[in-house]
Amino acid sequence: MNQLPIMAKQAAEIASNAQELSNKLKDLVIDASWQTNTNTIDPLVFAITIFVLASFVGYYVVWKVTPALHTPLMSITNAISGIIVISSMIAITSSSAFEFSSLLGSFATLLASINIFGGFIVTTRMLEMFKK
């Protein structure tokens, strides 16, 4: 019976130590979550990186293709530009009159349309060369 108060005192110390460790662990988890949130990649840097890599890949694909495959490459480029035109028109209609997305969508529609019409002209000239 004399050991009961000693065991109660030890249990209280263990509970106190467990509570202290729990509080420290909670602080560590909060600090870790703050550190992971501050080390994320900026979306603008990510988008610019993808743009630069896509530019290099596109450059090497276009310049390394054999001349016999230029016409199919032009048709694929026209198809991709058609998808861009549709997407940019959706961007124009999904916002109000003078928001950034509508202006960017209008600019994308203009550039993709120029690309499509230029592609058709170049493809027509290439096909006329094969007729001769």
From Swiss-Prot:
It holds the Pfam family PNTB_4TM. GO terms for biological process: NADPH regeneration. GO terms for cellular component: plasma membrane. GO terms for molecular function: NADP binding; proton-translocating NAD(P)+ transhydrogenase activity. It catalyses: NAD(+) + NADPH + H(+)(in) = NADH + NADP(+) + H(+)(out). Its main location: membrane. Coiled coil: none annotated. It is an enzyme of class 7 (translocase). It comes from the Bacteria. Its EC number is 7.1.1.1. It is found in: Cell inner membrane. Keywords: Cell inner membrane, Cell membrane, Membrane, NAD, NADP, Translocase, Transmembrane, Transmembrane helix. The chain crosses the membrane at residues 43-63, 72-92, 103-123. It is a multi-pass membrane protein. Complex of an alpha and a beta chain; in Rickettsia, the alpha chain seems to be made of two subunits. The transhydrogenation between NADH and NADP is coupled to respiration and ATP hydrolysis and functions as a proton pump across the membrane. This is NAD(P) transhydrogenase subunit alpha part 2. It comes from Rickettsia prowazekii (strain Madrid E).
